[in-house]
Every structure is written in structure tokens, then in C-alpha cells.
């Protein structure tokens, strides 16, 4: 890795892309010059549209890829057209919608409602092989499946509705067993906790169905399109597929997604499923087609809803069966066996009610007599039951219907009765007799005094006492963690030394060497000997230093104001009050010479009372007064100068105010501003007809008057006070007590006609004080921290850890720099680690660290900061501040390299930025592991989350355990934004109407329409989710909500009238605080939610009123539309509006690189077109066109020559002052005038930009302009004040965009989510451009937080552009995300952990141990015992999860011993180094090593005739081991393709026996250890075991069960079981096909074939191939270090990696490696 890669100007190896030039057809006749530069540049990757690898658009320079043509952009067709004939081919139609197997948890957990088709769920549950349909099924099994299926979604925050279509009853009724199973399941649900969620509809044409979808806008419908299996029903008459397909298709046409009800895997923090995305569908005949496929039988629905039969009359299931049997018998259709079967049903019910799931059955009789009569009688009974169940009223019913029917029990009893055996248990004879009589049965039952049906369940042998294989364990750590190890036994116990050591075998037979694999960043850099190379390196460092300074200054905005003076000793640090007595004497806890203070005191001078002043103090005081007087005179001169700037005076004085130091000059400055603002309003907005304009214009004036009254009154002179009072009174407000306004002021010529309370609420929300308690604190410089921020400083001073939760832009990051400063001051060796979630944030932190701490004198060979990512490192082991990503810190913490261990021992603090990533990223488990592994204090900075207390509870408990109670984690939770957010929605024309042909469209007079968040609420969603806790209305919105509620309720109008509520008289100088505003808001919210349950009519009225302004826009967006086209059509109109209203700079977020670039170009093209058009006008030609430029050049030269002559001669004393060069140079003057005239066609940010910074950035970028097209494009865009930012840009381009936007040279920036996580890019407006799947509520909160940043804006704007109605609702109504605990560890992670703990102790230069085994074991113990999942998962409440984790650790140790990767003591051995190095391959890594140890690869290579064949053979194996991309369910294999597989064929036959042996051993061990986790030692849940179809040996744990039959509290995660099933099947027994993209690409090398044949989106293809190539590289390096250089496997892997990498780079136009 390059040492300077993070900041190097040169492109990374993947950044320079050469592509063929192909024209891009833009929708305009004339293309300005900027469009031409884009003809070669089309970004290939759409990073969010279906990309599973990187939802957050990870900013890897390596992902810069270009397209050959528009088709290769991988855009999905926006519109699907279906004729009536095509509609009949429904499966083919569904296959045209984008479908992928992905993590869908962000689509529903805590954010959205989804729907589940219960009819389909019943069909799919019934399809599981562990059902016993030979005996008409068992209610317990089916109902338990449904309960478990629903509960797993409830556990992760899912909210859903269960939908039933009554017309399907006709289909179900064709089979009695199926009909009864459905009715029983529906009755069970109606009588359970989900009763309110159960909704009935006739069919998809039902108006109520349409209303539900419109009211709830669910995220998706969960449904399968498959028919019932033959195992359940052999009848060919039943065909549910057509109806299910029409339901799914209908939902997709309504802009709602579909999740298929098979292969759904609910893990700890993810839900994997087949997800079908909707598109715009044009199908004129759809409604007719839909109606033709449904009966529209309203009678069936009425039967379901009639509730004629009160079920509270039945106390037990036996009571219900008596009623059923009586009704059935009354039909007179029963045969001779009816009474016997009925008696068996009643007795079965009594037995099951007594025994529950722990029941036994009679053995199956070989002489059983079950003729057709029995089947007819069973149908008669079950049909009678269906009639009752379908009309059941479950109100007040306590009847448990979960175990209504057990066919196995019924038939076993029936067979015994038919054989005249005694069956009736003695204890049940009285109860049975009662029911026997009620049912009118005549068949007698003999009493069984032995009560066989009540025999105890056979005891289960402890799974740990007879393991299939057992290895010795001597590690004290693992024995303490898993005490059950002591009782583990096996008949196949393996004694040490009795099994062939694979490593020794390979050393002896193949001369393998097993060299250690050292981290590249830990290797010493080679010393540069060559003088020229040394000079070049020094120049590079100098250049980097200049770049650091430039970047840092743009980042912080205050230049050297934040630069820390390390010669200064900070004053005041916090200590725990009860510990102050001792530490006051010693000074412990602070820096050298630092004075202590009480927590939160702020270090204010003069806090201690002094008895008297010394002479020295008096002299110092006199000197200070003299100095202040000089400062005051200087500042007054500046103010006077500002007052002389005419129209610009207010702007000048406003900018000057923040730089003034003295209170009297600050007061004078505010006074002068107020006077000038008042004069402007008097001149321009006087008169009653301009009152509304005057109200808006007076906001700044009122704010400055407020400052005069509140802050500066004591420092104003009398005349100034009088003038301030006059201004106040002239606005229509009462004069302050004791003041006398002038007669002119009393005329109130500027009367606003509104009192102060209402004025602040309606117009002046920015005037409302946040009351954050800012105070000067000597511990920080440059600003006064708020109260909650001082708590953060106190926490660091006390040496505690802290969890800091605050909204984006609240100001929580600065504490990390205080922490860094403290460590830098205390030592030259100690280290602070800053963990960032993205490399964009890494660059920012580097800049901030340099800006603040570059003055520190570092030891020789040590840098201030270093960076470490997976792609590059810079001074990683030679720095005091390491800035890294989670994966790399984990590698550091568990490294066994001595140099790395020594570095880790110096880590004193770790800062985790954006720690909420613990539940929102693919690396979330690593965040959790790091928080447990580190043994030093930490700061965890997080955005607002839902379960902050749960997160704090976990962190605090683990921290106290790690520190033996000496440290704790302080929770600092702050919820207030500094800037209000005003929401609005883009005003568009109907996207489904006719196109007016305009290039840049505009709908009406307003470009945007204000959006009240409550305007998108729906009553049902409010009931389920309530109002988000963090949703804070603006002052205007609070007033609006009050007005709407007051309209419909007089009590609310009186009780919450603002003036009355605040207890203030509005005509006086009343200043509302933010806390008072929140008090009013919360009171209104509380009343609002009360009405939701008590008076829904009021709620509907209010919501209708609030929705009215945006109702049209919401209806436009309710149907699918071409989102990209809408954004492109309206972007110019929108930016024009923002520019006119002064709401730039703006960031437009689009998680699609192509969209970012397209919108930027569209906007720039229009500005250029306008400029060219203006240059053709007479005005331009007459005023600004430069004519005869050559003559002007000559004239300017002549003037300069004359000036030079005069300078050389004697100066004429009488001559006037010398003229400026511009005055002498007419051409320069004309050019300047021209530039000012054309400035209107450019966009500028804050303060108009900095020309010097712009020139430096352009110069820096132009170095790569010859070879990089995107640089040329950006330079053209920069000229217009426009930019874009995404992961495809290299470091230089991204840095330039960030610097120029912060400096104001860019006003509009189009960005992917690279700028969403903590990057400092303050703007006034945030636009959400084109919707993508990855735009989650959490991401929305982070992105919108960019708007109205503190210190820049009083308020910010959020605009929804091409966002569908359903997504707008989801973003605004979603609850705060609740973080879930991750699976704590995997087998490979435990290998790394065990090897780290049990390594030999390393000594430093002084002969001391860097770390001891005891210390390492203690760190591992905290990780093993304190998983976050223990605090978040239901299974942990009874200790089952804790036991499961212990058993998993013991299983992992046994498996690693079996693979010879660990010694009995736990030391890594043999190929452990390689396994750890290649751990990214997960399960494939372990299997690869197993096969390698068995020399399988060598045998395979020998079986091929050529090297090329060997490479293909090994590649096929590796594709099977390391790729797991599923084909869609609609995929149909084509046999017309040559050389490609499309779907993986599986492993060569040579390897299959070894893989089967490995899988059998691993699975057998896993089953035993997991069974030991259960309460009774049984792997299977007894509710499923009753079917008699479960067998521990035959049931596959890798099968895609919809509901696995494992014990109830088993915590499932696919990462736990380290096997690969190459014949994996779903719950219906269908083989799951895997995509052969990795193999096929090597064969054809074409990305187009990957899209056309393998069905990959181009962005997905890039990431998949990149990851696979990375795995090949790691395997090649690993085997190279293990084997001899000329080993056949080494040669094949190295050649394979080389060839694969070349093909990959060539296919995607990337620069090949040297």
C-alpha cells in the first residue's frame, strides 16, 4: 500500500479509466461545450439500484468505472407495457420486474408497515416436509409455524397487517384438509395477539383493498405465487397460483414491492429475501383481466365477518368438538365408523389439552382398518368445524385454538378402538363420559388403567456426553467461559498425536514452509538511497503539507483560530466531586500546571473569591484596561468604516460583528445594523399595502433589536437606547417600561400588525432562543461550548467513556479533538485512534487534526497522524493520532505481530464516530467487537437512535466489567437542532399526463410547496408507530397545527392559545424560548394523539386540511413515474428559485452516480445556453462586448511603457496620484465589467467564493486533466459553480469539490451518500433528488442534517424532488431506528481471538512484556460475555442465548482442533495464519483449507492435461466456495449457451466425498452443541416433533425452511454454521440455483454478457467481481507463504489471480497493474 495514497495527487491504480468515445444523445438540439466533454464520460456504476455490496456508496477510489454506451449504464426500464394477451402469461410478466435476493430489513424494521398474505403463508407453511398430512395434519404444527414466523418480525421491530381474500375460500374448499387447516389458522390468529392486524377482503378488486393500500402505503406485500403441494393435497382441481399471481401483479402496478414467501432468512440484524421492485405499468385491460380471475363472492366475505357463533360458550377444545360432532351427526351422512372416529376426536382433544406438546402416541398398527368410510367421516367432521370456525365471534373468548386438531393422535386412538384395545385413561373417564353423552355417541370405550397415553416422555440423553468427535481442551480461558467442557465425552475422542499432522505431511512430501504472513503496514519502509528519488519524496511531502493546510483551512473556516498552542497550559478540568479532596493536592487528572474545577463550571476566571489584590495584579489590571482602550478605538474605527459602505454596510457590519472582542463595540455594531435595517424598511416597505412584505423583511431587524434589549442594553448610550425604543415602537409594539418613545415613533409607520408571540411563531422562528447555556470554557478556544458540550469535556477529564447522542450538526464532534489534545499534551508516545465509517470522513478528520495540532513538536520518526484503510496506509505505526476504519482497527487489536502489539499498547483513547453504524452497515458486528475489545476509555458519537438507553446500558455494563468498576460510560443525550428545518415538495405537473415539450419545466408560480409533516400522516400508521420522537416542528408549523386544531375544537382553541399558554402579553418584548415552543408542541401532539383514539373524525378533518396544500403533488407521486426524468426536467427551475430566494448553497442527494452527473450537466448546460443567448442581445453588444481587442492590448502596452518611463525619471511633485493598473488598462477594466455582467449565469455559495482557493484547486486538478475525463468535466462545471461528488472520483477530485463547496465557489452540489456520514459540508438547502432503495429514514435524517448548519444558517430547507409519496411518508413518519445486537462471533473470528490470546508473550526493547496472556484473556472475556445481543434479543431473557453462545464457542474450538488450526491450549498452528489472512472468504476459507490439507487440489490439478484446464477447474471450485449469489426464482436455464454455466454446476466429483465428509462432521457437531443450548437438550421444538417426521440425523440445517423446526429460543444466524451446501434446497424441496458469474466472466471476459446472460446489474457485477478478485489475491498470497514457490497449487492460484485481475480491469476500462 502506498504511504501517501490518502493525499497523493497522483491517481490510484484503479482511477484512470480509458474508454471508447461514443456520443451521448442529449434531449436538446444544441449542446453547449460542457456536454461535449461528457461524451466520453458516463459512470458505469449505479451504486444503489440493486447494489447489495455497498448501499452507502463507499468512497473507494478503486470503484471508478466508465461506460461504453448508455445501455451499459444498467438502467432499468421505467415503463412496462402489457396487452390483454400478454396478461395471461403472468409468470413471464412478473419476471420482467427487477428481482434480487437482498437484505430487506431497512424496508420495514421500525419504519414501515408491510402486508402478509395469510392465505399464501398457510400454503407455504403447509409445504414443509415435517408436516404429517397423511393424518390430515396437526393444528399445533401449522399454528406454531405461523406464530414463529410472525414473532421473528416483531422481535426486530416489524409492524404488519395480515390480509385474507375471502374469494380464495372456494379454492381451499376443494380439499377438506386444506380448508380446515386454513380455517383453524385464521381462527387461531383471530383469537390471538394479532387479531387487530387480521383484515378480510373479497379480492383485489374490493374497494376496501384499494383504500387500505392508499391509507397505509405499505412497504411491500409478502406473498408466494406457488400452488399447494401434492403432499398436502393431491387434487388437481386446486390451483391457487393464478389468484396469487394476480394479487402480486396488482400490487406491483400500484407502486408497491413484493417479497416472495420462500427462502426468507431472518438473522440477527438482517432479513434476506427475494425482493421484487415495482415499475410503471401500462395495462389498459388489467382491471377487466383481474375481475375475470376472481369470483367477487360477497357472501364468503360476509360469512367471515358475520361472527354469528359466540366462541366464549366453549371453555375447552373438547366443548367445541362436541358442537362440531353434533352438527355433523345431524346431517345424517355419517357411516358406521362415525361414532368411533368422533370418540377418538374428543379423547384426542382431552389428551392434547392435558399434555400439551409433550405427548406420546400409540405405535402405528400394521393391521389398521381405515377405509373410505373413515375418510368420508373425517371430511364430514372437519367440514362442520370449518363452518363454525368461519363464523366464530372470539370476543371474550379464552378458548385456545392453537392445538385444535391432532390427526396423528386421532388416528392412533381410532386404530386402537377399531382393534378393541383399551384406550381411555382412567383419569379422563369422567370428563370423557360427559362429552360422550353431549355428543350423543353410542360407541363404548374401555378404561385403560395403565394410562398408556399418559406415559412419561423418554428422557433425552445429554447431547454433550456422546459427541461424534472430541478433541482435548487445555485452555484455561475457554474452560472458564464454557464450564460444560468438563462433562463432554465421546466414543471417538481423539488423543493428541494419534492423527496425522497435515502441515508436517505437506512439509515432508511437498516441501511446504509455512512462513508467517505479516501485515504490510507493519513492514519497515525501505530507506531511499537514490538522491533524485529522495528529492522527489521531499517535494511530495512539501506539497502534501501545503495541501493539508489548504484543505484544513477550508474545512474549519477559521484558519489558525483553532490552532492549539502547546506552550499554553489549559485552565480548568473536571473531576468527580467526591474525589476532589485528594486530587486537589496532587493535581491528578489534569495536564501539568492545570487548575481543577467542578464539572461543567466552564473554567471561568474569577470564580474563586480573592482576599485582596497584589501590586502585580493592579499593574496587570491597568495594562489590560489600556489594552482594551486601544482595542476599543481600533474596533470603533472598523465600525465607522463599515457605516460608510453604503448599501453594503449591513453586510459588512454583520461580518465584522463576530470578530469584535469588547462588549461596548459589539453593542455599537448591533445598534448601527439595526438603525440601517430600520431605515431600509422605512424607505422600501412603508404602507399598509406592504404589511406582509414588511413582516418578512423585518425579521433581521427584530432580531437585532432583541440583541440590543437582551445582550447589549447596558453598553448602549442614552440616545442610542432612545432610537432603539423608537424603532421598536414604530413596528407596533409597546415601549419598554420607563422609556419614552418619540411622537413620530408612536405613529407606527412600520406597524407589523401582529403581536410578538405570533410574530415569532409565524415569521421569526429564528428569533426563538435555543437556551443551550453557552459559556466560555478555558479548555477550548474559538467558541463558547454549550452546557451539554461541557459535559462531554468533563467526561474526558474524568477519564470516563461517553456515549454522545445528538442530531446531525449539533456539535458533538469537537469533543474528540479535545480528547486528542489531552493525549497529545500528556505524552509523546500515547495514541488516540479515530474510527470513521468511511474514507470521505477519514480525509476530513485528517484535515481537522492537522488544522488544530500541527504545531506540536513530534519525536523523530513519529508523525502527528496516520491513516489506515484496507487499500492504503500512511504512517500507521508511527503516529500519535491514527485515523482508520473498523476492519483495520480490529486487525490491529488482534494482531500477533510484535510491532503492532507494541503500537496497540500505547492506545489511550478511541473515538468511534457515527457509532450508530453498529446496526446499519455490513461491518456492524466489527463495531460491536471493537467496543468490547478495547481496554481504554472511548467516545462513541452517534446520531439519534430509538433505544439509546439500551445501548448505554450495554456499553456501561461492559465498561465497568473491563475496568473493574473504575470507569463508567456517561450518556450525553441532546435532541435539539440548532437550525429549524423547513420542508417542501417540488411542484411538478402530472408526470402521467401529456408532455408539453418544454425542456425545463415549471408547474405554476411556485417552484416548491411547503410541506407540513403531519400532512402525510395516516390514522392507522399513527396508531402503529405514533409520531416519531425526534420529529420537531418549526415554530411556523406549531402555529399552523394549533390553528388547524383550534378550528375543530373550541377547548383546544382556548387552552392552547399561544399568548395564554406562554403567559405573556404579545405586544411587549416577549421572547419565546425553544423549550417553551417544545412545551406547546408536545401539548398539541398529546391532544392530537388523544383524538386518534377518542375522536377520529377530528383527526381526519385536521389531516385533510394539513394535506390539502400538497394533496395534488402526493397524488401525482402515488403512482410509479419516471423519477430521473422528473428530476432532470425541473432541476433548472428549482435552482433558479433557490437562487432568487437566497437559499443557496444546496446539496442534491442521489444515490446514483449517473443521476448526479446528469443533473449537474443539465443545470450547467442551461446556464451556458442563457449566457450565449445573452451575448447575442443588443444590450450585451453595446455595453460589454470587447471590440478591437488587439488595439486595446497595444494601448495598454503603450500606457505601461509610459508609466515605466515616468518611474525612471524624476517624479513631478505637482503631478496627481498614480493611477491603478486597471485604470490605465482599459482592456482589463472592460474584462472586469464583462465578468461582473456574466456573473448572473454562474452560481455562487456563501460569500461569493474565494478566487485564490479556486485558482489553486483548478491548478491542482489540471495536472490530471489530460488523462482523466471526469476532471475536465468537473472543471467545466466549476466555472458555473456546480459540482458532483461520488465514489467514482479520485482523491484529488473529491478534495477539490469539498474545498470549493466549503469556500463558496460552488453553490450546487450533486452527491451520493458519500457526504451523508459526518462530512462537514454546510449548506442552506438539501434536496432529495431521485429515490432509491437505500434512502432509509436514518440516512434521510443524516442527509437532511446538512441543511442549516450551526454558525451558518438560522434555518435550513429540505426539498423532496422525485420521491414517491410512499417514500415521503416513510421518511417523515418512521420511528427512530432501534439498534439490534449482532451475532457476536463466527468460527473464523474465534480462531483469530483464540490465537491472539494464547500466543507467546512479546517483550519490548526494555525486556518488559508488551501484553500478558492474562491481559489478553481478560480482553477476550469481555467480548465473549458481553455481547450487545444479550441486551436486545428475547432469547437472552431466560439465559438461552448466553448458553448458545457458550456452546458455539465450544463447538468452534472443537472444529478448529479438527481442522488442526488450534492446539489444545488454543494457540494458532499450521494453516491458522492463512485462515486468518483469508477470513473474508468466511465458510469457504475453512473448506478450502480442509481440502488443501487433504491435497485435493493437487489431485485435481493432476487430473487435467493443460495449465488452462487446471485453472478453469480450480476456478470452478473457488466459484463454488466463495460466491453465493442466488438466481431469481423466475430464471429459466438456456441450453443454447456455450462455455458458460450461468448457474453453478457444483464441485467436481473428485472433491464431493471430501466435502460430504466435512459437512457431515461439522453439522453433526453443531447439532449436538446447539441441542445442548436448549432447556431440555432437544434440538427440535416439541410442537414440531409431534408430527413424527423429525429426525436429528436426517433433517438438514442448511435447508431454506420458512420456519425451522428447531427449539423455540434458538437464535438463528446464517454465519453460525460454517458449511456450504452445494445442493441447497428450499422448504418445497426445490434446489436453489447459484449464479456462476465468477466462472463465466473468466471464460468470456465481458461485462455485457454478465448483464445479458447472468442477469446482473452492472454495478452489482463490478462489486462482485472486485470481491472475488480480492479473495483470489488473498488465497494466492496465503498459499504462497505456506507452500514452496514452485508448488503446482501456488502456480495455478497466482496465474489465475493475475489473469482474472487483468480481465476484470480490461472489461471495466481500469488501468492494469504494473
UniProtKB/Swiss-Prot annotation:
Keywords attached to this entry: ATP-binding, Helicase, Hydrolase, Nucleotide-binding, Nucleus
Pfam name, any one: Helicase_C
Short sequence motif named DEVH box, residue ranges: 913-916
Location(s) in or outside the cell: Nucleus
EC number(s) reported in the record: 3.6.4.-
Start and end residues of each stretch annotated as Disordered: 47-70, 584-616, 1197-1223
Domain Helicase C-terminal: 1237-1391
Main location as per UniProt: nucleus
Gene Ontology CC terms, in alphabetical order: cytoplasm; nucleus
InterPro entries in the record: DEAD/DEAH_box_helicase_dom (IPR011545), Helicase_ATP-bd (IPR014001), Helicase_C-like (IPR001650), P-loop_NTPase (IPR027417), PIN-like_DDX60 (IPR055124), SKI2_subfamily_helicases (IPR052431)
This protein's record includes keyword Cell wall biogenesis/degradation: no
Biased composition (Basic and acidic residues): 607-616, 1199-1218
EC class (word): hydrolase
Ligand binding (ATP): 607-614, 806-813
Name by which UniProt lists this protein: Uncharacterized helicase C28H8.3
